[in-house]
């Protein structure tokens, strides 16, 4: 009986430790270096995934708000 209780507490503690770890997309994103295309990462999007955060929008994109610091939320022109 005591072994089952200890196993339960161990698994319960491990669950909460794993929950506290950030996901791969969020881990270190604030300190990541941007890619040459001007994007931070695939997971760095804005406007519900319809735009990308860039320093400058491409020719076929228009600025549609701000992401953070000096970055614009760029969306495709329609």
Swiss-Prot record:
The keyword Signal applies. Disulfide bonds join 43-74, 53-67, 57-73. Its main location: secreted. Residues 1-27 form the signal peptide. The keyword Secreted applies. Specifically expressed in testis. InterPro entries: Beta_defensin_dom (IPR025933). It comes from the Eukaryota. GO terms for cellular component: extracellular region. Has antibacterial activity. This is Beta-defensin 105. The lineage of its organism: Eukaryota, Metazoa, Chordata, Craniata, Vertebrata.
């Amino acid at each position: 009986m005591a072994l089952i209780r200890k196993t339960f507490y161990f698994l319960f503690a491990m669950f909460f430790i794993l929950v506290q770890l950030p996901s791969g997309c969020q881990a270190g994103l604030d300190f990541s270096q941007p890619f040459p295309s001007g994007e931070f990462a695939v997971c760095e999007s804005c406007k519900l995934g319809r735009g990308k955060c860039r320093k400058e929008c491409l020719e076929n994109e228009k600025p549609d708000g701000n992401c953070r610091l000096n970055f614009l939320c760029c969306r495709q022109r329609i």
